[in-house]
């Protein structure tokens, strides 16, 4: 059995997994929508989205747009629609999402629609990208990206603790940068889907 967490972190993870307060089943429908709004606000904020929490709530619950960039509103709407869709599929319809390339590409397409070209939405990038604030350069060769992504998706199965699996996928997909844009949003969504699969309350990253 492989671990990311140290002994103390494993104990905390076990506490979370066993706590009834961490279960999605304990949330009402209205609370789930509130959770989605909070998740989308913080996920967008990490990306530099300029919407405040109040503006985000008005946009996602009431359809009221702020006088800000179209891309900011589109980012939040895409995140919200994807998050709610996954919650309904897993929580309400009692399904489990398989974390594979097909799911990853579908989630990226849902998150990036209208923000990148149709040819790049839901497809691996064929151009080099950079991560600001670091000297690390993600692989730029398509075959190398495919190979490393395959390794990540294969290796996830060595983690039996869903919280460790969520962290592993989040960090490694974000580092690989398999898409032209929206990599961190997609990795946070995958992280949340892993937790949803275990009917866990997914807090903002």
Residue spans of the language-model regions?
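FIC/Doc superfamily catalytic core
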Residues: 1-203
